[in-house]
Amino acid sequence: MVKISFQPAVAGIKADKADKAAASGPASASAPAAEILLTPAREERPPRHRSRKGGSVGGVCYLSMGMVVLLMGLVFASVYIYRYFFLAQLARDNFFHCGVLYEDSLSSQIRTRLELEEDVKIYLEENYERINVPVPQFGGGDPADIIHDFQRGLTAYHDISLDKCYVIELNTTIVLPPRNFWELLMNVKRGTYLPQTYIIQEEMVVTEHVRDKEALGSFIYHLCNGKDTYRLRRRSTRRRINKRGGKNCNAIRHFENTFVVETLICGVV
């Protein structure tokens, strides 16, 4: 704040004031000098403009957050579609209910045509096959669950009638690998290829009891756990079917190739 005072002029001004003072009397003698108080004007500052740099950085951050949210949404949507659509379709494509006609030269001298049905599950990533053979309509074999484990190189037969398991080395000359078997069944499903209708026979004999089932791998372990399990040794494989006669053998008919296989398990305990 600036204080400005006006003082009376020297000489003539003093004489005039003296005359006026004498005329006005003592009241005016005590009048103070005039003062004006001036408040200095505020210094005007130019308006500050916001930094464009800060604004651009904020915009980039918001854009990045939006992109992250969008990508997360796409990822979750992809996972949902994969789990509920692709995997479901893949499971359907890996499950087959199959039926094949074949000539049976064992039941009678006259060759008759029989139909063999089975349910097949092919696990491509785990590299194994699981086959369920229901009770045959016209005899000729026992119902069974079969696992071909290509990782362990083992085959396990669970004879449902006996409730016993039998394990043997995987015969890759008869059993198609999962990928090849899957392609075969897909072609059959489309009607572009039909398997041949002949049957071969393989004969096996029981050798020893298996105590450590965990050493057989998780797939066979889950199939045979809680059941008497035995090792098998392959005796012969032949195209011609021999009658079993008085042999102590159980038969399981199945197919995992372009032909039907009758597996004879002899020396059953």
From Swiss-Prot:
Q: Which GO terms describe its cellular component?
A: Golgi apparatus; lysosomal membrane; lysosome; perinuclear region of cytoplasm; plasma membrane
Transmembrane residue ranges: 57-77
Q: Which domain of life is it from?
A: Eukaryota
Task: Describe the processing and modification events after translation.
Answer: Type I membrane-bound, as well as soluble, furin has a pre-eminent role in ITM2C proteolytic processing. PCSK7 and PCSK5 may also be involved although to a lesser extent. The soluble form of PCSK7 is incapable of processing ITM2C. Fails to undergo shedding by ADAM10 and intramembrane cleavage by SPPL2B.
Q: Which GO terms describe its biological process?
A: negative regulation of neuron projection development; neuron differentiation; positive regulation of extrinsic apoptotic signaling pathway
Q: Per the database record, which ranges form the BRICHOS domain?
A: 138-232
Compartments in which it is found: Lysosome membrane; Cell membrane
Q: What are the recorded GO MF terms, alphabetically? A: amyloid-beta binding; ATP binding
Question: In chain numbering, where does the site feature Cleavage fall?
Answer: K243, R244
> Which positions carry Phosphothreonine?
T39
Q: Which InterPro entries match?
A: BRICHOS_dom, ITM2
Membrane topology term:
Single-pass type II membrane protein
List UniProt keywords, sorted A-Z. Cell membrane, Cleavage on pair of basic residues, Disulfide bond, Glycoprotein, Lysosome, Membrane, Phosphoprotein, Signal-anchor, Transmembrane, Transmembrane helix
What SMART domains does the database record attribute to this sequence? BRICHOS
| S-S pairs | C165-C224
Q: Could you tell me which Gene3D superfamilies the record lists for this protein? A: 3.30.390.150
* Residues bearing attached sugar chains per UniProt: N171
Q: What does this protein do?
A: Negative regulator of amyloid-beta peptide production. May inhibit the processing of APP by blocking its access to alpha- and beta-secretase. Binding to the beta-secretase-cleaved APP C-terminal fragment is negligible, suggesting that ITM2C is a poor gamma-secretase cleavage inhibitor. May play a role in TNF-induced cell death and neuronal differentiation.
Give the family this protein belongs to, as stated in its UniProt record: Belongs to the ITM2 family.
Q: Subunit comment for this entry? A: Interacts with BACE1. Interacts with APP. Interacts with STMN2.
Annotated protein name in UniProt: Integral membrane protein 2C
Per the UniProt entry, what species is this protein from, by scientific name? Mus musculus
